[in-house]
Amino acid sequence: MSDKPDARPSARLSAVTLDDASIGHSSADIDHERATAIWDLIEDNSFAPCGDPGEGPYTLHISLMESRLVLDIKRESGEQVVQHHLSLTPFRKVVKDYFLVCESYYNAIRSASPSQIEAIDMGRRGLHNEGSTLLQERLEGKVDLDFDSARRLFTLICALHWKG
């Protein structure tokens, strides 16, 4: 876990995919949000499996399997590097709270004052930060990633729960 990106240009993700079976059918708006989150992560990230003797860049396939988050990490060539299975239990509360605040935020945009919208958005960002920190902690010793990359990855974990 680090606050600054790894200095190696190879310590990064070049592709990220979400398992279709894990996300199910969704609206065009939700599909667009997921695609944007993936693009943001690929554009700017620091990501390296701990103890990997090889070089990146890496590809990441994210799925849900038996109530576990599966991070399947490979090299661009397709060579398997590692697959991590993380329990979703530690994420349940923060993801649930995050969705509740997001729903409040989207409802507030239609009718609330700018100060109310800002207050809700601050809460949303705080929960997003909490989820990102939790993700970094759960990946400690498994994957080295900076906070901004953890934020973008947390967005995608939420996307797996956001089935439209």
UniProtKB/Swiss-Prot annotation:
HAMAP family: UPF0262 (MF_00678). Disulfide bonds: none annotated. It comes from the Bacteria. Belongs to the UPF0262 family. InterPro entries: UCP032146. This is UPF0262 protein Xaut_1232.
